[in-house]
């Protein structure tokens, strides 16, 4: 009796440990075929306070305005030079969400494509938004919300954030729906956000525990085949239960991400380092150039003033002593060990690469 009881206690303990790190399946995977569609359009923003396009440098703005006025029954004499300052040509983009129906609204992003100084306070005129098939799926119009601010006077200017782009919340009305087919004969395919055989297998096992064996099957490290009800009206309720299942995420692959442009270093909690000795010296080159002027000592002579450049180059190398890096099995110890080196983020890039080559860094190194 004691052995089965001990096994039961151990099973419950393992189950609790797995549930502590469990996540909803909807946060780990998406349904194949359920996605958004990109829309794009060209339009005009009016009502700017003298900060619009300079039509001489952006002739397409004047041409677009002329075409729009002609559609409204207003004829502009050919060859007329309109000096406009309150109009800007813009590109309008939006994402048509899945299952969107005509009459629903979506947010749009408006970006200047000319030389307008600011879109603040402008109004986007009616702009058709097209998909990749060149069909109109939404119509955008409304007042822009620009997050930046700026002012200029006397040749000086101050600007905060970006002024040539803005958003219109619920600024586009959907005119055409995109058919979304995600279930065929009751079969749905789930795509994991990250390729991981362990997490994919855990997700399939969680579905089978809830709905019975054979309901889900992992096809590879990313895709899961799920057999749902054949009745299409029952599929939404079934998928709602599937998405809310708790799935234990498998330990992630140890990885260190290095941004060589900014010097940023990011690592996950599974990174480990082995004991190693590290020596890294800072090599700096300082170049100082000053121009010295030599003039003749005696006035009223034929001597000439000569400018001679004086360049001084100094090469300095600091540090370089061997330092011991102890074995670290968790992220906190890894951070302490690397901080003990006293290296700057830029130095840390070279140190991590060298440790990876020496086999002391137990992680994948990815440079972006």
Curated annotation (Swiss-Prot):
A molecular function GO annotation: structural molecule activity
Keyword annotations: Bacterial flagellum, Periplasm, Signal
Pfam family name, one: FlgI
Superkingdom to which the source organism belongs: Bacteria
Signal peptide residue numbers: 1-22
GO cellular component term of the entry, any: bacterial-type flagellum basal body, distal rod, P ring
Listed transmembrane segments: none
Compartments where located: Periplasm; Bacterial flagellum basal body
Gene Ontology annotations of biological process type: bacterial-type flagellum-dependent cell motility
Assembly and oligomerization: The basal body constitutes a major portion of the flagellar organelle and consists of four rings (L,P,S, and M) mounted on a central rod.
Functional note: Assembles around the rod to form the L-ring and probably protects the motor/basal body from shearing forces during rotation.
Family assignment from sequence similarity: Belongs to the FlgI family.
Name of the protein this chain belongs to: Flagellar P-ring protein
Organism: Bordetella parapertussis (strain 12822 / ATCC BAA-587 / NCTC 13253)
